[in-house]
Amino acid sequence: MKRRILLLAGGQSGEHEVSLRSARSVLAALPRDQFDVTPVVISKQGRWLPPTETQKALETGVSSQGGDLMLHRAAAAEGYDAVFPLLHGPMGEDGTIQGLLTLAGIPFVGSGVLGSAVSMDKVMTKQVLDSAGIPQVAWRLAVRREWQQTPDAVRARAAELGYPLFVKPANLGSSVGISKVGSPEELDAALTLAFGLDRRVILEAMTPHKPREVEVGILGNDVPVASPVGELSFDADFYDYETKYTEGRAEMHIPARIPPEVSERIRTEALRAFRALDCAGLARVDFFYVEETGELFLNEVNTMPGFTTTSMYPKLFEAAGLSYSELVTRLVELALEER
C-alpha cells in the first residue's frame, strides 16, 4: 500500500526559491510505486497555495501572492502518513512548522521543535555546543536594546575579540545580514544592519588564517551516521549570500582535500553536535578547518539543508553510495520511525 506524503515547499524566508527547486527534485525522486505525494507551496506572504497555484509555482519557480490560509487542512493532515517540510530558514526550519505538525500528531521529516529551534538560533546553538565541549570560534552576544542604550558596552565586546570579526544576526539563514568588519570604524554600520534584522546579534572572532570550509551530512534518528566530508572553495572573503546563490562562485569537492584523520575528527564532532542539539532525520554540519594550525571549529548546523540533486547534502551521501532517490526514501522512513 502506498504511503501518502504531504510535501511543503516555498516559505517566507530568503531561501524560498531554493526550496522550490529542492521540492521539484524530491517530487521527481520519490518512487511512485511506494509514495503518493501531494505538494503544497507556501508563498512568501505565508499563504498556502491551492493545487493549481502550487503546480505553477513549482514549474516557474515563482509563487503567487494569493491563496488560502489552509492551516486547518495542514494541521489536520487528513489522510497523510507523513509530511516532508522542505522549508529553509525562519518560519520553516526554526521549529514553527514542526510545532504545528506536532500538535496535529502527524509524523514529519527532520528534527522536532526543540532540535529545529535550537539549531536555527545561533546563540542557543553556541551555548549548547559550548556545554558539550565542541570547539567554536570565540564569540560575544549583543541585544538591540543594549546597542540603543549603551553602545560603548557592545563596542567593548568587539574589542575583546579583536579585528577583523564577523557580525551576524542570531536567527537568520542564507548568510543574510552578515558583515565582515575590518576595523572599529566599520563596526557601527554592521551592527545597525544586523539589528535591523534581529534583536540579538552575534559578534564572532575570525581565525588568524583563512579557514577551509568543510561540511558533513548526518542521516538518522537516535543512531545517526555521518557521510564523507566535502569542501567548498571560493574566492570571496566568506561564504556570503551572493557567493552561495550565484552559479560558478563556489566549487564543491567530495571528498574534501584534507588528511583522513581530520575528516574523521570532523565526522565525530558532527555526530556529537547532532546528538547534543537533539536533531533527527538529517542535518548538514559545517566546520572551519585551519590548515596552518590544525584547528577545527564548528560553524553551524542546518537541519533542512538545500536538497536539489546538485546540493552538497545529497552529494555527500551519493559519495557514500546512497542515490538521491534512496536518500529521500530513507528520510521518509526515518520520519515514520517511533522516536
Curated annotation (Swiss-Prot):
<keyword id="KW-0436">Ligase</keyword>
<dbReference type="GO" id="GO:0046872">
    <property type="term" value="F:metal ion binding"/>
</dbReference>
<dbReference type="InterPro" id="IPR011095">
    <property type="entry name" value="Dala_Dala_lig_C"/>
</dbReference>
<dbReference type="InterPro" id="IPR013815">
    <property type="entry name" value="ATP_grasp_subdomain_1"/>
</dbReference>
<keyword id="KW-0963">Cytoplasm</keyword>
<feature type="binding site">
    <location>
        <begin position="158"/>
        <end position="213"/>
    </location>
    <ligand>
        <name>ATP</name>
    </ligand>
</feature>
<protein>
    <recommendedName>
        <fullName>D-alanine--D-alanine ligase</fullName>
        <ecNumber>6.3.2.4</ecNumber>
    </recommendedName>
</protein>
<dbReference type="Pfam" id="PF07478">
    <property type="entry name" value="Dala_Dala_lig_C"/>
</dbReference>
<dbReference type="GO" id="GO:0008360">
    <property type="term" value="P:regulation of cell shape"/>
</dbReference>
<keyword id="KW-0133">Cell shape</keyword>
<keyword id="KW-0573">Peptidoglycan synthesis</keyword>
<dbReference type="GO" id="GO:0071555">
    <property type="term" value="P:cell wall organization"/>
</dbReference>
<comment type="function">
    <text>Cell wall formation.</text>
</comment>
<keyword id="KW-0460">Magnesium</keyword>
<dbReference type="InterPro" id="IPR011761">
    <property type="entry name" value="ATP-grasp"/>
</dbReference>
<dbReference type="InterPro" id="IPR005905">
    <property type="entry name" value="D_ala_D_ala"/>
</dbReference>
<dbReference type="InterPro" id="IPR011127">
    <property type="entry name" value="Dala_Dala_lig_N"/>
</dbReference>
<feature type="binding site">
    <location>
        <position position="302"/>
    </location>
    <ligand>
        <name>Mg(2+) 2</name>
    </ligand>
</feature>
<dbReference type="GO" id="GO:0005829">
    <property type="term" value="C:cytosol"/>
</dbReference>
<dbReference type="GO" id="GO:0008716">
    <property type="term" value="F:D-alanine-D-alanine ligase activity"/>
</dbReference>
<dbReference type="Pfam" id="PF01820">
    <property type="entry name" value="Dala_Dala_lig_N"/>
</dbReference>
<dbReference type="GO" id="GO:0005524">
    <property type="term" value="F:ATP binding"/>
</dbReference>
<keyword id="KW-0961">Cell wall biogenesis/degradation</keyword>
<keyword id="KW-0067">ATP-binding</keyword>
<keyword id="KW-0547">Nucleotide-binding</keyword>
<dbReference type="InterPro" id="IPR000291">
    <property type="entry name" value="D-Ala_lig_Van_CS"/>
</dbReference>
<comment type="pathway">
    <text>Cell wall biogenesis; peptidoglycan biosynthesis.</text>
</comment>
<feature type="binding site">
    <location>
        <position position="286"/>
    </location>
    <ligand>
        <name>Mg(2+) 1</name>
    </ligand>
</feature>
<keyword id="KW-0464">Manganese</keyword>
<feature type="binding site">
    <location>
        <position position="300"/>
    </location>
    <ligand>
        <name>Mg(2+) 2</name>
    </ligand>
</feature>
<feature type="domain" description="ATP-grasp">
    <location>
        <begin position="126"/>
        <end position="333"/>
    </location>
</feature>
<comment type="similarity">
    <text>Belongs to the D-alanine--D-alanine ligase family.</text>
</comment>
<dbReference type="InterPro" id="IPR016185">
    <property type="entry name" value="PreATP-grasp_dom_sf"/>
</dbReference>
<feature type="binding site">
    <location>
        <position position="300"/>
    </location>
    <ligand>
        <name>Mg(2+) 1</name>
    </ligand>
</feature>
<keyword id="KW-0479">Metal-binding</keyword>
<dbReference type="GO" id="GO:0009252">
    <property type="term" value="P:peptidoglycan biosynthetic process"/>
</dbReference>
